[in-house]
Regions:
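Acidic helix N-cap motif at the loop->helix transition within catalytic regions
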Residues: 78-81, 102-111, 155
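Active-site nucleotide-sugar/metal-binding loop of Leloir-type enzymes
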Residues: 130-142
Length: 424
């Protein structure tokens, strides 16, 4: 009996001037201002001397900007050393611990990191982020917010200084939200949590965003990459009530209404998901086609699980119409047809999906659209239609994506046997 995959329940796809590498020879006016030698009546205290030495030290290095990393954490002792190694190119590192009961704080201090502890009740991500941002010194030129389960690829500091301009307020960079066992990106998009200090604040209780307080000047730096290695043991149970609070506080915020509907889907609250995402689509500010199409796909998934397959088909067709340049709507429609044993429609739809070669760098992209699943569906559907040569052909391509997949390997043997002896 051939196994079938339920591709509809997917994990969250996450909540993206060429300068010389070295500054020119320093001139005299680049030196820091020294104390007035004429006035010896008031000597600088020890802290003032240290600040002056720090300022002079920075002026004599290759770095043009003061770069500070900041983060929040709780019970993440197993990530501390790896995270520190990836961010230590910064001038200073500040971490706000929100109530760890393990050795997180101890390990952070052993790395020389500035640590403060504060417990927030009730918990909100934006409040904690803003509190951690307060720890960053006011003379910081560039702030970088990361989490302890993330790792910068080496050399990010040099690339940041290469592309950051005096009037830049924010930088976008590559974020690998999910990676395979060989450290190859599965889900990749731009992240933009590198910023100036005084021009931003964090907003929203969960899926918090960095909100600009003035006009932005954003630079995209493709040569900076941040990898995400999540702790799958951590609970995300707080997300749903925080999202409900977020939408209650700002019911017209299309982004958070979309996130809330998606969260209902993850909790299998199908009717709430449908109602919430229909509301998202009705909002005047909900204009981003990728996200609108995602809401339509999630509505379709909910109808699928309610066994209302024609409504699911209708919403997937609407998703394709909304964003015909994305594979995702076609992929899920192909799966719907496959699950309903409409194999000719499955093949036609999967082939339409494969005509789309672009893979946008946004958080809204489904792994199954680019991981060989379409070839798997083509192979099984071809087999059901007794097109055994096509089944072999398509499954061979699926195996190129997943050579160690036992199900695909077993299916391939079945396809080969049927191709050789179609009447058996």
């Amino acid at each position: 009996q051939m196994e079938q995959q339920d591709l509809l329940d997917q994990p969250e796809q996450m909540e993206q001037q060429d300068l010389l590498d070295q500054p020119e020879q320093m001139e005299q006016q680049d030196q820091p201002d020294l104390p007035d030698q004429q006035d010896q009546t008031e000597q600088p205290d020890q802290q003032d001397r240290q600040d002056l030495l720090d300022q002079q030290d920075r002026s004599m290095t290759e770095h043009k900007y003061k770069v500070v990393v900041y983060a929040i954490c709780k019970n993440e002792e197993k990530f501390v050393e790896r995270w520190y190694e990836s961010v230590k190119e910064a001038d200073e590192i500040y971490v706000l611990d929100t109530g760890s009961t393990d050795d997180t704080v101890k390990k952070l201090k052993e790395c020389g990191i500035h640590v403060k502890t504060k417990v927030f009740k009730p918990w909100r991500f934006d409040v904690a982020r803003n509190e951690s941002l307060k720890m960053v010194p006011d003379d910081t030129d560039i702030c970088i917010c990361t989490d302890l389960d993330e790792v910068f690829m080496p050399g990010w500091r040099k690339e940041l200084e290469k592309y950051w301009q005096p009037d830049t307020t924010r930088a976008r960079y590559n974020y690998n939200w999910s990676l395979d066992e060989n450290n190859n990106p599965i889900v990749n998009f731009y992240l933009d949590k590198i910023h100036t200090k005084k021009d931003y604040k964090w907003t929203h209780p969960v899926h918090e965003v960095l909100t600009a307080l003035k006009e932005e000047r954003v630079v995209t730096i493709d040569s900076i990459t941040l990898n995400h290695y999540p702790d799958h043991e951590k609970s995300r149970s707080s997300y749903l009530p925080l999202l409900e609070l977020s939408v209650k506080e700002d019911p017209e915020n299309d982004r958070n209404v979309h996130y809330l509907g998606r969260e209902y889907m993850y909790y299998h609250k199908w009717n709430r998901c449908i109602d919430t995402l229909i509301k998202h689509l009705s909002l005047k500010t909900a204009t981003w086609k990728d996200e609108r199409a995602a809401s339509m796909r999630f509505i379709a998934r909910s109808y699928f699980h309610l066994k209302r397959y024609r409504e699911a088909e209708m919403w997937l067709k609407l998703a394709i119409e909304e964003a015909p340049y994305l594979r995702d709507g076609y992929t899920e429609l192909a799966f719907l047809y496959y699950s309903q044993e409409e194999y000719e429609k499955c093949i036609h739809t999967a082939l339409q999906a494969l005509k789309i070669k672009t893979h946008p760098k946004t958080y809204i992209n489904e792994v199954m659209s680019f991981d060989g699943t379409l070839y798997d569906l083509l192979a099984i559907s071809s087999f059901r239609l007794k097109q055994y040569d096509y089944a072999v052909y398509w499954n061979a391509i699926a195996l190129e994506y997943k050579p160690d997949d036992v199900r695909l390997q077993n299916n391939h043997q079945v396809y080969l046997q049927k191709e050789a002896n179609p009447n058996d």
